[in-house]
Curated annotation (Swiss-Prot):
Name the UniProt record assigns to this protein: Phosphoglucosamine mutase
Species per Swiss-Prot/TrEMBL record: Bifidobacterium longum (strain NCC 2705)
HAMAP family linked: GlmM_B
CDD domains according to UniProt: GlmM
Pfam families the record matches: PGM_PMM_I, PGM_PMM_II, PGM_PMM_III, PGM_PMM_IV
Transmembrane segments: none
Keywords: Isomerase, Magnesium, Metal-binding, Phosphoprotein
Catalytic activity: alpha-D-glucosamine 1-phosphate = D-glucosamine 6-phosphate
Disulfide bonds: none
EC number(s) given by UniProt: 5.4.2.10
């Protein structure tokens, strides 16, 4: 039986793969596994609590109701925070000291999909073992509470949202002694593309409270338009709007706002690698980049690593997935990490990738540095990169096939220090991703095409 939890929780087609019944069972199982982390005396009035939030997909309503029902039936009082970014639930799980948090979202996926991910006390995503434990007891009967032992479900989107926005603004603009709000972004004209998703209220409000002049697009969710030709996966509107309005930059979020990409004043995309480079150098300048190290994944561009090396900043690599980035950050006491896709974890303020926090911090660095985003990003040039997905192959054999490994070694020898290759099996599909970076796009294309051909020939199902 295939593993239910993927790299970011449980995902699938809502009402087909991810049903109300499954959401109910997941809530029930999560109570059994995560409820063991503490005793009922840990919480006010002896009741254990869970926090649930969601993005703007229409299926989020019935899935939230079912998930909450499973938790309440297991004896947890559930606070339904309504529509709120994923990192908002992580933050509130920590500050409200609830036993666990859960988010119903499929992030950047199309609207028909949805997903469920959990946070343990403290606001951290679950390790693989805890997800395995939940899966192991899924659907099993157990001695559930009765009578006064069952939980209640309450709804409080306003309080949850306001607490989260206050936190975000305070990361770059803590209140003055007289309780007035500083405006560090005053005069900064930016465009924010909210993907018609969970940060449609949060990001514009946080940026404006910090003083920015914000032009907002794709912030009218209707349940069906999340990520539709909008946000970080479709930045064309943002690029055009930045140029049309003479904004100094733009920021784009995905559906649950755990990632952020940016656009400079000319409409050029600034990816997660470049954003991490800019923020790492800023933290280094302020003495806040622990061990002068940035945590990245194997997908981060070699150009980033070479540029950081010249600045005296080391990089540590992990597998793809912000949960693995965080695990490495905690293990090595590192303060900043992330992914090329725009997940950036700033441990000073967050326990997971937070797109709105990234946008605020990036805007603040533009102001502090006195440079444009284009100028800042230019210090982190990206090597040309080619990625080819090779479908319908035995992905598990990629690392042991001799012809493939010999071909990889040969290409690496030819590239030397001017590029690299990477073969990465998909976590969810029978395919292998072949990536090559080189000094020119043409050479990256050549290398990637040669390797993809060999992978297809050797591993075809």
């Amino acid at each position: 039986m295939p593993k239910m939890f993927g790299t970011d929780g449980v995902r699938g087609l809502a009402n087909r793969d991810l049903t109300a019944r499954l959401a109910l069972d997941l809530g029930d199982a999560a109570v059994r596994v995560l409820g063991d982390a503490g005793t009922q005396d840990d919480q006010p009035e002896g009741r254990r609590r869970a926090l649930v939030g969601r993005d703007t997909r229409v299926s989020g309503d019935f899935l939230a109701s079912a998930l909450s029902a499973g938790m309440a039936a297991g004896g947890f009082d559930v606070i339904d925070a309504g529509i709120i970014p994923t990192p908002g639930i992580a933050f509130l799980t920590s500050v409200l000291n609830v036993e666990m948090g859960a988010v119903i979202s499929a992030s950047h996926n199309p609207m028909p999909d949805n997903g469920i991910k959990f946070f343990a006390r403290g606001g951290f995503k679950l390790p693989d073992q805890k997800e395995d434990d939940i899966e192991a007891v899924l659907g099993q009967d157990w001695d559930r509470p009765t009578g006064a032992g069952v939980g209640r479900v309450s709804h409080d989107q306003t309080t949850a949202t306001n607490l989260y926005i206050d936190h975000l603004v305070a990361t770059i603009a803590p209140l003055n002694d007289d309780k007035t709000q500083p405006k560090p972004l005053k005069g900064l004209k930016i465009v924010a593309d909210c993907a018609n998703g969970a940060t449609s209220v949060v990001a514009p409000e946080a940026l404006r409270r910090a003083g920015a002049d914000v032009i907002v697009i794709n912030a009218s969710p209707d349940g069906y338009n999340i990520n539709k030709n909008a946000g970080s996966t479709h930045p064309e509107q943002l690029q055009a709007m930045v140029k049309a309005t003479d904004a100094v930059m733009g920021v784009a979020f995905d559906g649950d706002a755990d990632r952020c990409l940016a656009v400079d004043e000319d409409g050029n995309m600034i990816n997660g690698d470049q954003i991490m480079g800019i923020l790492a150098r800023a933290k280094q300048r302020e003495g806040k980049l622990n061990h002068d190290t940035l945590v990245v994944t194997v997908m981060s561009n070699l150009g980033l690593k070479l540029a950081l090396k010249d600045m005296g900043i080391k990089t540590v690599e992990t597998a793809v997935g912000d949960r693995y980035v965080l695990e490495e950050m905690l293990k090595g006491d590192y303060s900043l990490g992330g992914e090329q896709s725009g997940h950036v974890i700033n441990r000073e303020f967050a326990t997971t990738g937070d797109g709105t926090l990234t946008a605020l911090t990036l805007c603040n660095e533009v102001v502090k540095s006195g440079k444009s985003l284009k100028e800042l990003a230019a210090d982190f040039p990206q090597l040309p990169q080619t990625l080819i997905n090779v479908p319908n192959v035995d992905k598990k054999a990629a690392s042991t096939n001799k012809r493939i490994q010999d071909a990889v070694a040969r290409e690496e020898e030819l590239l030397g220090d001017t590029g690299r290759v990477l073969l990465r099996p998909s976590g969810t599909e029978p395919l292998v991703r072949v990536m090559a970076e080189a000094a020119t796009q043409a050479y990256a294309d050549e290398v990637c095409t040669r390797l993809a051909k060999i992978v297809a020939e050797e591993l075809a199902l």
